[in-house]
Amino acid sequence: MLKKLILGFIILLFCACNDEKIDENILSKGTKTTEQYKQDINNLDLNSYKEIAEFFKDNQNIVFSDKPVLIIFSANNCVYCDKLKHEIQNNKEVQNILKNTYNSYYINTSYHKIHNYDNKKTSTEELSREFNIDATPTLIFFTPKHKTLLIYPGFMSAKRLALTMEILKDEKNQKLNEDELFKTLFLAYKEKNV
């Protein structure tokens, strides 16, 4: 028993005399996370639309103010979402309308995020359920007062998108009932051949 005690003391002495310092970088700091880390996690979805992100507002805070609102729902590995991004990326008119005329938001449903929407915190999944997002892309157009004007599932060309945004920003068109609005859009699409 005495031998074990002496051996333990010798081992403890050698360990205490060791000059190596513990590398604090390999130790966990517990649940403390930096603000940069939190921001990076919240912006993971930005990489999925980085080529057009400058035309959209931060989707964590969806604001209804004096401008109409457009929310585009997309997903990873969605061919038509990529095609829509390409259309936006290559059309200055659409870029200008998205940035200056609308409060525009791009939400990738492949990522979990919390959004401030309708004065409450709502997850991406809850928003998708609220608007019955079954297919991507889906474009949802709102009045500044939060009335849903149009839910458009599927791809929309840049020319049709620009025309749709121009028609839906007009207050007189925002007051039309659903049938009248669809008729107005259909006739405009036909006239402009988009």
Please provide the spans of the model-predicted regions.
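Short active-site neighborhood of thiol/selenol oxidoreductases, capturing the structured segment around
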Residues: 64-82, 104
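Sec-dependent N-terminal signal peptides
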Residues: 5-14
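A short beta-strand-turn-helix
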Residues: 49-69
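Non-globular targeting/processing and membrane-anchoring segments
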Residues: 17-53, 151, 162-194
